[in-house]
Amino acid sequence: MSKLVPCLLLLGCLGLLFALPVPDSRKEPLPFSAPEDVRSAWDELERASLLQMLPETPGAEAGEDLREADAGMDIFYPRGEMRKAFSGQDPNIFLSHLLARIKKPYKKRGPPSECFWKYCV
């Protein structure tokens, strides 16, 4: 009898929940989706800020250093911050060059007879 009361309450709540109408999501687009141009502008700002936060890479030549190359312009934000945004070139190019320096060289293992698929003994 003590389990019957909670079960009836649960069924009563589920009945009310199932009585609510469910909108068909295929007919209407989501109301909070942003336009494409706003998303692309946001992605560009994120890339530029990521490049500014990257630490200097060890062993980089003086001419290739991002902090020494003045290939950008200053942008003032409402909070009083000042950041530098790159102009003229895609920030992905700089990021790929930085990541290529950090990448470890591929190290070949022993003869192929000792390896099965990608696991070597």
Curated annotation (Swiss-Prot):
It is found in: Secreted. The keyword Nuclease does not apply. Residues 20-106 form a propeptide. Disulfide bonds join 115-120. Residues 1-19 form the signal peptide. Highly potent vasoconstrictor. This is Urotensin-2. It comes from Sus scrofa. The lineage of its organism: Eukaryota, Metazoa, Chordata, Craniata, Vertebrata.
